[in-house]
Each structure stands twice: as structure tokens, then as C-alpha cells.
């Protein structure tokens, strides 16, 4: 194994060698027979972790990897390597010393993507506290005068709410799951925008503000995007926002047969935009790890998403629309695939989604008459759940804001 995320998952360890993704730089050899070997800087392991792992695993320093591979190759061993994730140097050592190679996708990718009950419980807990932090942030933002907050200060404030909320709810914010995308006005139209002091701009009256952010907690990883109006929103912004919202809802509410792939569902998030001659130039959704990488495969919801969606997989649902030089819109929730109620009169097993993210969607940007009855019912039910789950953890000011933000359409 050469992917640190897979190694972290297989051995149930985490680290902090890099920002945003809690793994340690490491390698591993998994044998068909015999104990696995883990190659990791042992200074990164506490004594209790060393003692526990040593019962099942041979632990080496990373510098020992080439020597161990050489010994195995000299015994004519056959190695399975993921060609997309392994260095050419490893392949060369194996071949030069008499070993053979079988190209195989990382065997941990699929089981890692199918979350077990403990991982799903942790993800729900992580999203519960994340939802409270998001409500506190958007409540605070609604009370600020336009142009008194900028992209950097907004992102910093959101992180502080996450850290404070986690402590109040008996947890800890370990890290962000990626650098926050905090884009006001035309900056929101840059899909992977990263604010810096040179590009930082205020949140101005009459503009849209797009914030795509996520957190790493010990029990789960979050990723959420909301687009809100700063002051009054124009008619074109409302129209485009509602088209994006329709796609997000239609995918969230989908029921589909077993064997369905991500590419089979991608159109649900786009069809409303297509009817208006619009689209977005990115995938609709990606897999998400369990206190691991915020982008995780093999599942995606995209035009190239060939992996079957299986119960327990977490995927993002994030359609958008971006008008260059003017505004950007994206609405993102995380979903988990789960068995769905049978269709009355049907005769096949169906799957659907549970929404994990618990944060209001800006009602001020919705053209209600563009929604179908089913879409309106879905959003009202979602907002009722957001209110129920978040309200007990909010003070009076934030709770009153949430009551307004989640009023039925």
C-alpha cells in the first residue's frame, strides 16, 4: 500500500503530517500469508499505539522499505501494486530483484468507502456540531453591515465558530478539511477560489457570498457549501439559485435501483439548469472519508462516475452555476447511500440518500413559484429537521434567526 489514506484506514491510525487530511506519511506491505508490515516514523506513534499495533503488525522505519521489498522480490514474490498510486522506483526494485508485479487497484479503496455503523454514527455526530457552528456563523453574518466583513475575516470567523462549538459540545476541531473557499461577488464565480490578501474583497450590499468549507473532527469529516445574499438579491441571481436548488433537491430525493452508478444520477442535478441553457463545469459529487480525506474514491456523482453506489458510501451533492465576472452559486450537502422504502407496487430493491448536512438554505434567494410541490415539501421537511436538530444548542439570538431561516415556504 502506498496511499497514506488507505494505510490510515487499514491500521486505524491517524496523523498530522499534512494539513487538512489526518494521516501519516507511510507505506505498508499486506501479505497473503503472514503479518503485515507498516513503515512509519515511529516517533509519530505513542507507546500505547506501538504496543497495540505490535500485537498484529511488524513496524519498521520508512528507510527499511526498499530492503524489505528487495528480500521479498529475491524470493520470487508476486507484488500487487496500484499503478496510479505507486512510484516507479518501487516497481524497478521489484523487477530488478526477481519479483513480479500484478497491477491491481488499491484493495482498501472500496471497503474504505463503505462506512460501517461506527463510522456513520461518527459522521452524524460530526455533522450535528458542524450544523450548529454554521447556524451561529450565518446568524452572526446576518447582523453585520454590508462591506464591514471581508472574505478573509468571514472565513476566520467561521473557523472560530467551529472550534468554539466543538468544545461546547464535548469535542474538538482538529483541522479544516480543506482551505475555505470564501468568495464574494465575482470571486464566487471562481470554482476553486482561494482568497489571499491581494484578492480579498468585502461582502458588499447586493452581492452573493459563496462559502465552501469543511472540518475534521475525530469522529468525522464535513464538507458544506452555502450561497447567501448580502442584502437584496437581484432577479437573475434568484432564478439561477433556484435552478441550482432544484437540482440539489432532486438528487437528494432520488430513489434508484441497486447497481446504479454515479454517472446515472449526475443528470438529476443538472436537468433544471439544462432546460435554461445553463450548466456547471465540475462533477456533482465526490466521496468523503471518515476523519480522512475530504475527497475520497472510488465513488463520484459525475459524467465519469462508473462506480456503483453502495449502502454506506458518503457522497457530496454540490451543483452550482458560475457567471464569470458577476457571481457564483453552489449548494452542497453530504449524503449517505442507504436502503430506501420499497415503491408501492414495485418488485425491486431500491436505494436512496440520507442527508447528513444540517444548515439552512437561504430562503431570500428562492423563487418559490419555480419549485414543484415535491421540491417545496422536501425543502420544508429539511428545514424542519435543521431547526429541530440545531435549536437546542443555540442561544436565544441565534435560535430566533434559525426560526426565520427555516420557516416553511
Give the residues covered by each predicted segment:
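Active-site neighborhoods and metal-handling regions in enzymes and metal-associated proteins
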Residues: 1-409
Amino acid at each position: 500500500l502506498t496511499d497514506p489514506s488507505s494505510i490510515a484506514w487499514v491500521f486505524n491510525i491517524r496523523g498530522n503530517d499534512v494539513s487538512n487530511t489526518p494521516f501519516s506519511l507511510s507505506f505498508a506491505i499486506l501479505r497473503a500469508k503472514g503479518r503485515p508490515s507498516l513503515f512509519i516514523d515511529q516517533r509519530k506513534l505513542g507507546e500505547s499505539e506501538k504496543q497495540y499495533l505490535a500485537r498484529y503488525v511488524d513496524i519498521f522505519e520508512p528507510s527499511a522499505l526498499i530492503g524489505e521489498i528487495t528480500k521479498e522480490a529475491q524470493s520470487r514474490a508476486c507484488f500487487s501494486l496500484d499503478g496510479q498510486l505507486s512510484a516507479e522506483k518501487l516497481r524497478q526494485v521489484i523487477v530488478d530483484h526477481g519479483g513480479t508485479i500484478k497491477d491491481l487497484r488499491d484493495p482498501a479503496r472500496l471497503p474504505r468507502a463503505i462506512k460501517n455503523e461506527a463510522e456513520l454514527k461518527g459522521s452524524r455526530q460530526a455533522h450535528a456540531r458542524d450544523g450548529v457552528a454554521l447556524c451561529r456563523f450565518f446568524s452572526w453574518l446576518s447582523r453585520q453591515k454590508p462591506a464591514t466583513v471581508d472574505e478573509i475575516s468571514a472565513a476566520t470567523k467561521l473557523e472560530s465558530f467551529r472550534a468554539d462549538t466543538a468544545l461546547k459540545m464535548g469535542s474538538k476541531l482538529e483541522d479544516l478539511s480543506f482551505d475555505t473557499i470564501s468568495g464574494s461577488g465575482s470571486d464566487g464565480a471562481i470554482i476553486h477560489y482561494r482568497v489571499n490578501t491581494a484578492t480579498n474583497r468585502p461582502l458588499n450590499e447586493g452581492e452573493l457570498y459563496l462559502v465552501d468549507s469543511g472540518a475534521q473532527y475525530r469522529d468525522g469529516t464535513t464538507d458544506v457549501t452555502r450561497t447567501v445574499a448580502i442584502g437584496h438579491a437581484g432577479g437573475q441571481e434568484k432564478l439561477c439559485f433556484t435552478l441550482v436548488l432544484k437540482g440539489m433537491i432532486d438528487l437528494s430525493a432520488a430513489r434508484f435501483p441497486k447497481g446504479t452508478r454515479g454517472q446515472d444520477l449526475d443528470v438529476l442535478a443538472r436537468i433544471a439548469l439544462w432546460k435554461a441553457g445553463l450548466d456547471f463545469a465540475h462533477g456533482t459529487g465526490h466521496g468523503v472519508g471518515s476523519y480522512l480525506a475530504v475527497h475520497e474514491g472510488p465513488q463520484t456523482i459525475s459524467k465519469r462516475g462508473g462506480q456503483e453506489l453502495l449502502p454506506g458510501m458518503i457522497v457530496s451533492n454540490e451543483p452550482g452555476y458560475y457567471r464569470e465576472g458577476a457571481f457564483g452559486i453552489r449548494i452542497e450537502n453530504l449524503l449517505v447511500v442507504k436502503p430506501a422504502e420499497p415503491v408501492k407496487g414495485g418488485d425491486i430493491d431500491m436505494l436512496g440518500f440520507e442527508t447528513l448536512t444540517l444548515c439552512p438554505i437561504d430562503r431570500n434567494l428562492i423563487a418559490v413559484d419555480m419549485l414543484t410541490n415535491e421540491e417545496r415539501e422536501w425543502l420544508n421537511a429539511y428545514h424542519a429537521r435543521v431547526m429541530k436538530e440545531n435549536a437546542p444548542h443555540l442561544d436565544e439570538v441565534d435560535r430566533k434567526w434559525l426560526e426565520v431561516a427555516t420557516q416553511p415556504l
